[in-house]
Amino acid sequence: DLEIEYQQAARDALVEAGIAPSRVRMISGSASAVLPKMNDGSYDLVLVDADAANVIEYVEHGLRIARSGGTVAVARALQHGRVADPAKRDEVTSAYRALITEVAASDAVVSSLSTAGDGLLLLTKRGI
């Protein structure tokens, strides 16, 4: 995240949940600059909650850096209900719709879509 106060709020929530700070790595920077530099297969959980127009690129990076059995969580996957409305054809909505369709057909991940709130897409990377 680019916002230091959001990172601090996340750290506080993790401590409150009993998760040791050493178990989490938070990186400040734009996803487009940071993700390409991250090591393959090194993370248990990757949260994609960034520039919606580039969601597919970020998920691809997320799957690359997630270990086998790791999860990529995609926030706002339903885009305020726009994904379910076939009349909505803007670039962002179409990207999320394509992402959901693609991962549903993929053998590389086990996917689950929660329709609660604005939607959360969970992609668990299958072992190789």
Where are these regions (language model features)?
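S-adenosylmethionine/decaboxylated-SAM
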Residues: 1-128
